[in-house]
Amino acid sequence: TRMDIAKKKIIEFVDSLAKLPDIQLGLRCYGHTTLYRPDRNCEDTKLEVPFDAAKSNAALIKKRIQNLEPMGTTPIAYSIGQSASDFPPLDSFNNRILLITDGIEECQGNPCQVSLELQQKKIIAKPYVIGMNVALQDQHQLDCIGRFFNAESPELFLKALYTAFSDMQYATTAQVYLLDDFQKPTETDVLMSFYDPEGIERYQWIHTLSNLGLPDTLILNPRIPYTL
């Protein structure tokens, strides 16, 4: 089944993280303790393995994943909201949620709004969402939560896990093109600032162009969503 394949790939992924320093992991699950019928439990979510150094709790996470069985509904919004209290009291912009799901919200919640609120409160940075072959017409309900990957095969699922992790850990680059009245990128020598979701200035540069008309390449923290 899709769940069996996902569990196998997640265990491989956790195995690799256990070898890295300065990584903390936790495991929250949903829809796994109460049967879907006769009554849906829209609060069916639990922090199964609290955050700790990956080398310390990777074995616990792998064991819990191995024994995990889907039983109930999909309370994504409620689960994201509950995860706010899961994280240790460290730099909140390092707090990341990696949501894995084979479906969409089933409990009338708004996971996109909950995700945005937690980002605005600086509890988490932008989440990552991996859908397990989610139908095209449903993907828009997930890609507003955070960066979305739709894994249509086991290979793409594992690739999505590592791509998300790489984005979480390493800096990224960007170029800013300032357009003139004719929609040409000729404007330059302008002071520009990058702001986090709370309006706090994170970076400030003077925009310049090279002799080839290319803007500077900027190095940014990928954990923060910016406005310019």
Model-identified regions with their sequence ranges:
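Short amphipathic beta-strand segments in non-cytosolic proteins
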Residues: 190-213
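Structural motif
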Residues: 101, 130-132, 177-190, 195-197
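Short Pro-Gly-centered beta-turn/loop motif in secreted/extracellular proteins
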Residues: 209-228
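Exposed acidic/Ser/Thr-rich ligand/metal-binding surfaces
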Residues: 1-5, 11, 15, 19, ...
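C-terminal helix of von Willebrand factor
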Residues: 137-179
